């Protein structure tokens, strides 16, 4: 009887020893480990594919340099932004083509304060034309429509000025009408104003600036801000002290 019990116990122990081991304790290189490695690799591959697809659908944010370059490119602007425009200046023009150098021409279309196309280019400045018969300016000036990419705002900070905007599927450029001295001379003695008595006064011509409301880039959004542009050439006179 005891021999039978010993035989059964030995057979039971042999059976336990010969049973397959669990996957938690499988040594490296075993088939179970290979299956786990293959599964892990497959999951990693799927994760990489998903990451690539996500990057394609949601590209990484652009660098500051790229944003600055893009800010002067063709940007789609919400028409409602022009409804919020105040303090409109005749020196700021949105045009689909270069404005004429002569202010007498009326062929350029631009966006006005009412979000409509307007052909009245600087009409107010034509009310007092300058005649060439015996009339001369104290300082010679030159005016032209220019494109600005950067400017100084009213707070003294450099800002990025929008050049091209896309409104209603049409591209407009932002122009600024600037006036400056024709031949600015840093030496006041050599840039006397015309018609000023040099025996009593020291005089010189200088370019003055003012602020106009322009469309600029602030981060990733377009916004209206006051920027500084050249607007006139004026004469500065200083009384000579020797006469007192």
From Swiss-Prot:
Annotated propeptide span(s)? 19-125
What keywords sit in the KW lines? Cleavage on pair of basic residues, Disulfide bond, Growth factor, Lipid-binding, Metalloenzyme inhibitor, Metalloprotease inhibitor, Protease inhibitor, Secreted, Signal, Toxin
In Pfam terms, one family for this protein is NGF
Oligomeric form and interacting partners = Homodimer; non-covalently linked.
Which cysteine pairs are joined by S-S bonds?
139-205, 181-233, 193-235
Protein species of origin? Notechis scutatus scutatus (Mainland tiger snake)
Identify the Gene3D superfamilies for this entry: Cystine-knot cytokines
Q: What PROSITE patterns is this protein classified in?
A: NGF_1, NGF_2
Q: In which tissues is it expressed?
A: Expressed by the venom gland.
Query: Residue spans with biased composition (Basic and acidic residues)?
Result: 47-66
Q: Name one GO molecular function term.
A: metalloendopeptidase inhibitor activity
> What's its job?
Nerve growth factor is important for the development and maintenance of the sympathetic and sensory nervous systems. It stimulates division and differentiation of sympathetic and embryonic sensory neurons as well as basal forebrain cholinergic neurons in the brain. Its relevance in the snake venom is not clear. However, it has been shown to inhibit metalloproteinase-dependent proteolysis of platelet glycoprotein Ib alpha, suggesting a metalloproteinase inhibition to prevent metalloprotease autodigestion and/or protection against prey proteases.
UniProt GO BP: cell surface receptor protein tyrosine kinase signaling pathway; modulation of chemical synaptic transmission; negative regulation of neuron apoptotic process; nerve development; nerve growth factor signaling pathway; neuron projection morphogenesis
The region called Disordered is annotated at 47-67
Compartments in which it is found? Secreted
* CC annotations in GO: axon; dendrite; extracellular space; synaptic vesicle
Q: What is this protein called?
A: Venom nerve growth factor 3
| Segment forming the signal sequence | 1-18
Instruction: Provide the family line.
Output: Belongs to the NGF-beta family.
InterPro entries (UniProt xref): Cystine-knot_cytokine, Nerve_growth_factor-like, Nerve_growth_factor-rel, Nerve_growth_factor_bsu, Nerve_growth_factor_CS, Venom_nerve_growth_factor
